[in-house]
Regions:
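Metallocofactor- and cofactor-centric catalytic cores in central/energy metabolism, strongly enriched
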Residues: 5, 10-137
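C-terminal functional extensions of proteins
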Residues: 226, 244-298
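Gly/Ser/Thr-rich loops at beta-strand to alpha-helix junctions
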Residues: 135-147, 234-240, 255-256
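Short phosphate-binding/catalytic loops that engage adenosine nucleotides
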Residues: 130, 158-159, 246
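Amphipathic coiled-coil/heptad-repeat helices and related helical stalk/stem segments
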Residues: 115-118, 209, 213, 234
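Anion (oxyanion) recognition and catalysis
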Residues: 126, 154, 242
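Glycine-rich phosphate-binding loop
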Residues: 217-252
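Long, charge-dense
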Residues: 145-212
Length: 298
């Protein structure tokens, strides 16, 4: 294990990063090194998401609960057993419905294959210098990943869109109807509570809702400006855009079946299975890997 981890981290072994948050990862030299990182950081392999949590999401999706559909309107009928089979195929979780407890497991090989497909879509839009939209419902963890992608696409000549900046969005939460403000940080859309600090100070609110991306895309259309050729993100940003016919790619955990259903039905282009709630710096090797694969490294 030390060989690939030493390659991954450059000067220090990955366990030192786990002990010291200020440590940095500079390069990813191989898929073997990235596979080791995925397992060491628990981005894949046994992940923090519980089997119970995932099964609950599958049941709610089968019942077409909008909290779990997050913008996807499935064309096919999906029951819980169908979803378990789909997630076993897409993520590598257990396909046995009798397995009802413990940690979910993501196959790192599936993550690597999906990261390559993700990079191919980035490379394609960069080659034609297309307009792109990036948004996240996981800003605390994933803002850095998307911001680096936005920076690289911008440097390649893509227009990074920021429509509806400051627009209010009413989102139903478990606490009732809440109003959020649309904001952009380094080209990445997110929502904030109205009393949150301005850009760059607070990372924004966690949200699964597709309403922000619908608001953003409607504003872009109303203004007569550019529409995105590619939407990059997670949760409702991917599902909401894909359902409206925009090419969308993103990241998803094992308790987010909507993105994988969208991919299976053709509404979403690429979904990368991984734990979407580990420490933000653990995504840096993925960023480097994806940008290298997409020929966007600076």
């Amino acid at each position: 294990m030390q060989g690939p981890l030493r390659q991954l981290c450059g000067v220090s072994l990955f366990p030192s990063l786990l002990r010291h948050p200020s440590a940095t990862i500079t390069h990813v030299l191989s898929t073997g090194a990235l596979r080791a990182h995925l397992l060491a950081a628990r981005l894949a392999g046994p992940v923090a998401t519980s089997r119970e949590r995932s099964l609950r999401s599958y049941r709610l999706f089968a019942a077409r609960d909008p909290r779990v559909l997050i913008g996807i309107d499935p064309e096919w009928s999906w029951n819980e057993r169908d979803l378990i089979g789909l997630m076993a195929d897409k993520c590598g979780v257990s396909g046995d419905p009798r397995h009802t407890s413990g940690h979910d497991v993501i196959d790192p090989e599936r993550t690597l294959v999906a990261l390559d497909a993700f990079a191919e879509r980035l490379e394609a839009v960069a080659q034609r210098k297309g307009a792109v939209l990036l948004g996240t419902g996981h800003p605390h963890r994933l803002l850095g990943f998307y911001a680096a992608v936005a920076d690289a696409l911008s440097a390649a000549g893509c227009t990074v869109l920021t429509p509806a900046h400051g627009r209010c969005v009413d989102i139903t939460t478990r606490f009732g109807l809440r109003t959020y403000n649309l904001d952009y940080v380094r080209g990445v859309a997110l929502v904030r509570e109205p009393d949150a600090k301005s850009s760059g100070c607070e990372t924004g609110a966690h949200s699964h809702s597709p309403l922000p991306v619908r608001t953003v895309l409607a504003a872009a259309a109303e203004s007569g400006g550019l529409l995105p050729e590619l939407v990059v993100g997670d949760h409702g940003w991917v599902c909401g855009a894909g359902q409206l016919g925009f090419e969308a790619i993103g990241l998803a955990d094992t308790d987010d079946p909507a993105l994988f259903v969208g991919e299976a039905e053709g509404a979403v282009s690429v979904v990368v299975p991984l734990d979407d709630a580990v420490r933000s710096d653990y995504y840096r090797p993925l960023t480097r890997y994806v940008l290298n694969r997409a020929c966007l490294s600076q």
